[in-house]
Amino acid sequence: MRPQLIKFTPGYDIKPFDCEDADLNGFLLETDSSIPNAHHHALELLAVTYLIEDMDAEETIAYFSVLNDKIEREITDSTAWNRLSRKQPNIKRRSSHPSVKVGRLAVSKKYQGQQWGRQILAFLKEWFTNDNKTGCRYITVDALKTAQGFYESCDFKVLVTPEENDETVLMYYDLKQYVTR
């Protein structure tokens, strides 16, 4: 196996991929308009998608997309907001905190259970703290409720308690804890 990280660009020939989730597959491979959402997001500068491909097997192992985000006081539980704000000097407290969002993260069925998702999150923690590429303090994710336990095992915390009928839960990881570990 020769895994390689590749920045997706429109027109790139994506190797076969199936994570058994139609929405996550569709983001990368197809939509009703026949243009993948990853393609649209790249053209409109909304998100950047990265592929991890096995160059020997010529298949996509996993992919993830990242985009700029912010944690806003108005949408955050007061307890969570206070927990975030206490970690910063008073002079730097504000009504929002800069973050980078993991817009999508999917691992091919063949590679699930082999720590690829965990490795991607570890890579992102390192990537956004090494030379501080975007000036973000947090990584956020709208995690599917079925994936909440996975993100918690990677030290993400719930930012907003979801309603019973919500499909996702807003979670965050404080990059400062990665820097100081």
Language-model features, listed with the residues they occupy:
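Conserved N-terminal entry element of GNAT/NAT acetyltransferase domains
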Residues: 1-20
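Short, basic/aromatic recognition patches
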Residues: 24-47
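Conserved beta-hairpin
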Residues: 45-65, 78
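Conserved acyl-donor/pantetheine-binding loop and adjacent beta-alpha core of acyl/acetyltransferases
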Residues: 63-104
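A short, internal acetyl-CoA/4′-phosphopantetheine-binding micro-motif in the GNAT/acyltransferase core
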Residues: 103-113
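Conserved acetyl-CoA-binding loop-helix of GNAT-fold acetyltransferases
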Residues: 113-127
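Conserved GNAT acetyl-CoA-binding A-motif
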Residues: 121, 128-143
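Conserved catalytic-core motifs of GNAT/GCN5-like acyltransferases
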Residues: 140, 152-171
